[in-house]
C-alpha cells in the first residue's frame, strides 16, 4: 500500500513538473507594419471603392498554454473611403487616421519552425487625423458643373462627430521562427467597426456610418522568456 501511495505521489509530482515545463509562460514583444484597404458602411448607401492606407505599431503576446495566448497591440492605422464616381472624372479620398488597441485571443498550431494562427477579439480606437483630398469643391458639390445628380453629398464635408471607435477584429497568419527567440509574422486581418462616425439618430442623414478594413502586415517578434 505504501509503495502504491509513493508511486502515485511520485507520478503526480513528475506530471506537475512536466506540465510546468510544458506550459512555461512566454512573453513576446515586437513591431509590425503593413497596408490597409478600407471603406465605410453607409446607410443610405454611398458609391465608393477601397481606399489604400498604411498601418504600423507594436505588439505584446503572452502565451501560457500550448496552442493558446493573448495579444495586445498599439497601432496607428489609416482608414476611410474613396468615392466612386464611375464615368464622371471626379476624385475624392478621405483618410481617417486612428490610434487603435486590439485585444485578441491568439490560437496557434504547428511545429518548432512554422506556426499557423487565428486571432480574434475586440478593438477600440480614437481618431487622431482627418485628411480630405479632392479635385472639386467638396464643400459645395451641387455648384460643381457636371456633378452627378441624386448623389449623397453630406458625407463629403461633414466633420467626424464620434472620434471614439470600436469593433471586432479577426485574422489568420503564419509565424516563422528564425531562431529560438526571433520570429517573422505575416498576417491578414479584417476589422468590422460597430461605431458610427456621424450621428445616427432618426433625424440624422445616416443611420449608419461604420468603418471596415482589411489589413495585411509583416512583423517581427522577440521572445523574452
What are the functions of these language-model segments?
Residues 23, 27, 61-142, 178-180, ...:
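Gram-negative (and chloroplast) outer-membrane scaffold detector with strong preference
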Residues 25-27, 48-54, 95-99, 114, ...:
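Residues that define the transmembrane beta-barrel architecture of outer-membrane proteins
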Residues 20-57, 161, 223-225:
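Short glycine/proline- and aromatic-enriched beta-strand/turn motifs that initiate or cap beta-hairpins
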Residues 1-28, 220-225:
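Bacterial Sec-dependent N-terminal signal peptides
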Residues 125-174:
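A charged, solvent-exposed segment within the mature domains of Sec-exported extracytoplasmic proteins
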Residues 41-46, 86-92, 155-160, 202-208:
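Extracellular loop and loop/strand-boundary signature of outer-membrane beta-barrel proteins
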Residues 35-41, 80-87, 145-154, 195-200:
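Flexible, solvent-exposed coil segments and beta strand-coil junctions
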Residues 160, 165, 170, 176-225:
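Predominantly the C-terminal beta-signal and adjacent terminal strand-loop region
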Amino acid at each position: 500500500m505504501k509503495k502504491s501511495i509513493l508511486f502515485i505521489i511520485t507520478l503526480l509530482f513528475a506530471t506537475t513538473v512536466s506540465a510546468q515545463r510544458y506550459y512555461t509562460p512566454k512573453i513576446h514583444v515586437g513591431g509590425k507594419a503593413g497596408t490597409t484597404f478600407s471603406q465605410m458602411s453607409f446607410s443610405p448607401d454611398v458609391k465608393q471603392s477601397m481606399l489604400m492606407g498604411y498601418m504600423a505599431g507594436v505588439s505584446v503576446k503572452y502565451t501560457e498554454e500550448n496552442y493558446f495566448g493573448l495579444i495586445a497591440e498599439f497601432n496607428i492605422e489609416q482608414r476611410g473611403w474613396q468615392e466612386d464616381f464611375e464615368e464622371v472624372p471626379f476624385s475624392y479620398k478621405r483618410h481617417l487616421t486612428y490610434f487603435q488597441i486590439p485585444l485578441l485571443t491568439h490560437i496557434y498550431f504547428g511545429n518548432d519552425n512554422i506556426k499557423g494562427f487565428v486571432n480574434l477579439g475586440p478593438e477600440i480606437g480614437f481618431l487622431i487625423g482627418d485628411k480630405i483630398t479632392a479635385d472639386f469643391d467638396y464643400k459645395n458639390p451641387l455648384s460643381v458643373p457636371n456633378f452627378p445628380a441624386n448623389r449623397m453629398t453630406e458625407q463629403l464635408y461633414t466633420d467626424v462627430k464620434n472620434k471614439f471607435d470600436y469593433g471586432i477584429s479577426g485574422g489568420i497568419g503564419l509565424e516563422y521562427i528564425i531562431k529560438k527567440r526571433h520570429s517573422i509574422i505575416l498576417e491578414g486581418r479584417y476589422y468590422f467597426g460597430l461605431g458610427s462616425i456621424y450621428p445616427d439618430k432618426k433625424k440624422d442623414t445616416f443611420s449608419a456610418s461604420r468603418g471596415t478594413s482589411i489589413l495585411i502586415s509583416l512583423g517581427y517578434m522577440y521572445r523574452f522568456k
